[in-house]
Swiss-Prot record:
Keywords per UniProt: Glycosyltransferase, Metal-binding, Queuosine biosynthesis, Transferase, tRNA processing, Zinc
Location of the active site: 90 (proton acceptor), 273 (nucleophile)
GO CC annotations on file: cytoplasm; cytosol
Family designation: Belongs to the queuine tRNA-ribosyltransferase family.
Example GO biological process: tRNA-guanine transglycosylation
A Pfam entry, by short name: TGT
Lineage top rank: taxon: Bacteria
Binding-site residues, Zn(2+): 311, 313, 316, 342
Annotated metabolic or biological route of this protein: tRNA modification; tRNA-queuosine biosynthesis
Gene3D superfamilies referenced in this protein's UniProt entry, alphabetically: Queuine tRNA-ribosyltransferase-like
Annotated InterPro entries: ArchSynthase1/Queuine_TRR, TGT, TGT-like_sf, tRNA_ribo_trans-like
EC number of this enzyme: 2.4.2.29
Name the record gives this protein: Queuine tRNA-ribosyltransferase
Length: 378
């Protein structure tokens, strides 16, 4: 039912294929983020048209609203949202730990972490909840996502090394409990490698996580892209990838700027998710083959050329920069839709080209081409 096939490599960059009950995923893959059962400003039909293979759902947000009972009555998340391709759900842990920093809503919430689990107040009503590894698995089994994540403790940057080691041990303990709690055969679980920003802790995290290898379909690299310098992010990714099993998929959680994806692919990562393309679309920052466009700028006011002449998306085939700027400045809802179609297509097309380049052993050349594109601010 589930299988990962490593097709070929170019250096450490990997070209693979994941088989799931809801379809095949060609890797390396970018997964658009559908936090609340939808990718913001997109319809499923549009996601299909631009080549989306898999979307990500968020356990924390879906647990709060609409709630597990409604999704259960609907027959699972695929049926509830009418999406027949693969879905990956995260554990909600990152969101829960982010509550303490006031990342949702207008206030900071109380978050208490213990070896048992995490107690928190939600950002909607301020109600108290308690997530344990068992509960998080139970929620995701109700959702019926293809790929599940266990509860883990994600630390911030900077962090005390002693605490980072404590969080690592807790994450391993929670993984063991998640494996014991898992019942469904038609879903798979990834192990999450923490260890913060120290090579020795990352190595220890891999060693401890690998003890459960027979129960895990793949491995996630967590706790990065939380404010640390790029060289640390790339360094930790490299350390972990060198130690992970060759024949299982690797997922770098929450990392999604184009340059970061390319650097991680070069180090051996297969899967990515991030809100960057969709969030940037809603703030007017658009990626093109010529460079990055700020569509709000008055310089596009009378530019009647396509946003990106090399792009095959609906937006670029039909509309000019001048019109897209007008829609954005006028705060028309269609501006968010058209911008999001384009940014996601840029990402998905980039991944298509990455896969082809790995097959043809020219990944480094393609990487340099894209790095020049994203450095160029138009």
């Amino acid at each position: 039912m589930f299988k990962f096939h490593l097709i070929t490599k170019d250096g450490k960059a990997r070209r693979g294929r994941i088989y799931t009950p809801h379809g095949v995923i060609e890797t390396p893959v970018f997964m658009p983020v559908g936090t609340q059962g939808t990718v913001k400003a997109m319809l499923h039909k549009l996601l299909d048209e631009i080549g989306t293979q898999i979307i990500l759902g968020n356990t924390y947000h879906l647990y709060l609203r609409p709630g597990t009972e409604i999704i259960k009555k609907a027959g699972g998340l695929h049926r509830f949202i009418s999406w027949n391709k693969p879905i990956l759900t995260d554990s909600g842990g990152y969101q829960v730990f982010s509550l303490a920093k006031g990342k949702f809503g207008n206030r900071k919430a109380k978050v208490k972490v213990s070896d048992e689990g995490v107690e928190f107040q939600d950002h909607l009503q301020g109600d108290k909840h308690f997530f344990t590894p068992e509960k998080v698995v139970e929620i995701q089994e109700i959702f019926g996502s293809d790929i599940m994540m266990p509860l883990d403790e994600c630390v911030e940057y900077p962090v005390d090394k002693n605490y980072a080691e404590k969080a690592l041990k807790r994450t391993i303990n929670w993984l063991e409990r998640s494996i014991k709690a898992k019942k469904r055969e038609d879903q798979v679980l990834f192990g999450i490698v923490q260890g913060a920003f120290w090579k020795d802790l990352r190595k220890k995290a891999v060693e401890e996580t690998l003890k459960f290898d027979e129960f895990l379909f793949g491995y996630s690299i967590g706790g990065l892209s939380v404010g640390e310098p790029k060289e640390i992010m790339y360094g930790m990714t490299e350390v972990v990838c060198e130690l992970l099993p060759e024949k299982k998929p690797r997922y770098l959680m929450g990392v999604g700027k184009p340059e970061d994806i390319l650097e991680a692919v070069e180090r051996g990562v297969d899967m990515f998710d991030c809100v960057v393309p969709t969030r940037n679309a809603r703030t007017g920052t658009l990626y093109t083959s010529q460079g990055v466009v700020d569509i709000r700028h008055s310089k596009w006011k009378e530019d009647f050329s396509p946003l990106d002449p090399e792009c095959d998306c609906y937006t670029c085939r039909n509309f000019s920069k001048a019109y897209l700027r007008h829609l954005f400045v006028a705060e028309e809802i269609s501006a968010y839709v058209l911008n999001t179609i384009h940014n996601l297509r840029f990402y998905l097309k980039m991944m298509e080209e990455v896969r082809k380049a790995i097959e043809e052993k020219r990944f480094k050349e393609l990487k340099e081409k894209y790095l020049q594109r994203v450095k160029n601010k138009l």
